[in-house]
Amino acid sequence: MWTRIKTAVASRWPGAKANLRALPRRLATLFWESFWLGVKLMTIGFLVGMGFWLALGFLCGLAHAADVTIPRAAQQYRATLVRAAHATWGLDAPVAVFAAQVHTESWWRNDTVSHVGAQGLAQFMPATARWLPSVAPETGKPAPFNPGWSLRALCVYDKWLWDRVAGHSDFERMAFTLSAYNGGLGWVNRDRKKARTLGVDDRRWFGAVENVNAGRSKAAFRENRNYPRLILKERQYAYIKAGWGPGIKDEVRL
């Protein structure tokens, strides 16, 4: 068929024979040029889209920071928390996360006692306060109403939990850590185990394990799920903005 077309065209327009001979090669070149142009445009679109979502996440964090008021009482404990965080986590410690955690636990009121008996700035239950020195001797004798002990114990206990959980990113890993601080490491492990049986990614907290309940009461489940979200997605940004130290960035999953 192609041969007959070439013969007919060549007999009618003799000068077109060479052009016809080169036509398949030109079509192939045009195809690949179009293909790579499409790839380049898709890549540019992806990068622009990723930048948009990262910028959106950052701006949302700033918006949340504007909604959060740091209690005046926090200032007197700022230096103590920074020292405790650096001693346990190093100089790049996510101080803003720990500050937001204390904010969430007690609103920086050292004399706070919850309805279930949790005590002090970091709201340690008496049993947990007694147990902690057995796995972290550096915390010393339990003293939940002593601000120095309480803030040091919070940083140490967070690190102990952090070393026993996993996540796809530091942001996800800290969410698991905070859930364990609030409700116990055993519950986190049970939630992750159930997530695996449901085909849910057990190394991802937000939008994954946070939706899985291995048996907690509705009230306990709701409180536990709000805890990492309030700290990581809202309150830490107020402390970052106020210059307390670094936090942990929300990595956008595309």
Regions inferred by a protein language model and the residue ranges of each:
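Internal/C-terminal transmembrane anchor helices
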Residues: G45-F52
